[in-house]
Structures are given as C-alpha cells and as structure tokens.
Swiss-Prot record:
Species name: Saccharomyces cerevisiae (strain ATCC 204508 / S288c)
Broad class of where this protein is predominantly found: cytoplasm
Protein name per its UniProtKB record: Adenylate kinase
Annotated residues for binding of AMP: 37, 42, 63-65, 92-95, 99, 167, 178
GO molecular function: adenylate kinase activity; AMP binding; ATP binding; DNA replication origin binding
High-level lineage: Eukaryota, Fungi, Dikarya, Ascomycota, Saccharomycotina
C-alpha cells in the first residue's frame, strides 16, 4: 500500500450517527488502526500498564482520566501498535479544546500530524428515532434496529441466535440529554478543526453506502 493511501484522522459524530459502521470501513480500506478511546482505556487497564493503573485509580474514585494520560495512551498506540503505521482513525477523542491542542502538539512532535477531522452530521430527531430502536448483541457488538435493520428472528442475533439487548441509556430522555451534552462539548472542537483547515462535514442521515462514498470523497481518496 502506498503512503498516499495512509490516513490520519479524527472521526466526530453524535451517538447514533454511524461511527460504529464507518470506522471499520475506514480501518479496512486504509489498513489503519481504529483508536477508540474507551477501548484503549480498557485495554491499558487490562494489561496493567503504568498508564492503565493510573487511569484505573482515577476511575475507581469516580474521576475523569486526565488529558495527559489520554494523549500518552494514544502516543503509546502510535509507538507500539503495528496497525498505526498506515495511520489511525481516532474515535471519541478529543472532546475538549485543551485535549485537541495537546493531541496536535504530540502528533506534530511524532511527525504524524492530523490530516482530516470528519464530522458525521445528523438531526437530533432522526438520531432519537435511530437509537431508541437499537438492539445490541453484547458478545460481538453487532447492532440491529427494530425498524431500520431488524434481526431475522425477533430479538435474536442472526449469527448465534443469542438474545439481543436494548441498552438502558438508549431511551429517548436519556438520549436527548446525551445529545445536548454532545453538542455543547463538540461544537468548540469542530470550530477548532475548521480554523486549522482540516474539518469536513458529511451528511450522515443518508444510507450508509452514500455516507461512505461521501467520506472517501472528503478524504480525497474516492
């Protein structure tokens, strides 16, 4: 794979915008690492690394893991994860301007600055309809939807036949609160990347295949 086919990007989008669909597409297309911050945290804690132990101590006390720990975890992935040599898709980070600034500084020091920040944009009303019908197969992470993508057999996973669950935070009121928090938190980040010139917005209310084509177009890789 040529270096022109590597990718270094941030994927931004509210719950239900389809990041879980598009991130694996990006990962496969560019042979890049999908760095979801929640997964990285869990992995570092499970491995008992210095960063993981520091993070666990803070989380056990109900605190938020510091920006420095998060940026160092990403740096650790870039250094030690072979999948990062063709680039990375950052998902769930940065969430604040100080995080974005620290991330930028670290990536520039590593000689791997961000190339794109893609924002998946969807109206809140559509997100509520999408998410409140969402069904998850816990063991695999496969997701279905009561209306848009129902399983072949009601409430059962197509592959294993095991029961599907609806996440407790997928009810409408909880979701509206999450979306309000998301917008308050994310708008400054979007402005930050607009100023640095790497932001691109994609209408994620379209069918997944159209969204995918649009993402490739925005990346200049179609």
């Amino acid at each position: 794979m040529s270096s022109s086919e590597s990718i270094r990007m941030v994927l931004i989008g509210p719950p239900g915008a389809g990041k879980g669909t598009q991130a694996p597409n990006l990962q496969e297309r560019f042979h890049a690492a999908h760095l979801a911050t929640g997964d990285m945290l869990r992995s570092q804690i499970a491995k008992g690394t210095q960063l993981g132990l520091e993070a666990k101590k803070i989380m056990d006390q109900g605190g938020l893991v510091s920006d420095d720990i998060m940026v160092n975890m990403i740096k650790d992935e870039l250094t030690n994860n072979p999948a990062c040599k063709n680039g990375f898709i950052l998902d769930g980070f940065p969430r604040t301007i100080p995080q974005a600034e620290k991330l930028d500084q670290m990536l520039k020091e590593q000689g791997t600055p961000l190339e794109k920040a893609i924002e998946l944009k969807v109206d809140d009303e559509l997100l509520v309809a999408r998410i409140t019908g969402r069904l998850i197969h816990p063991a695999s992470g496969r997701s279905y939807h009561k209306i848009f993508n129902p399983p072949k057999e009601d409430m059962k996973d197509d592959v294993t036949g095991e029961a599907l669950v609806q996440r407790s935070d997928d009810n409408a009121d909880a979701l509206k609160k999450r979306l309000a928090a998301y917008h308050a938190q994310t708008e400054p980040i979007v402005d930050f990347y607009k100023k640095t010139g790497i932001w691109a917005g994609v209408d994620a209310s379209q069918p997944p295949a159209t969204v995918w084509a649009d993402i490739l177009n925005k990346l200049g890789k179609d």
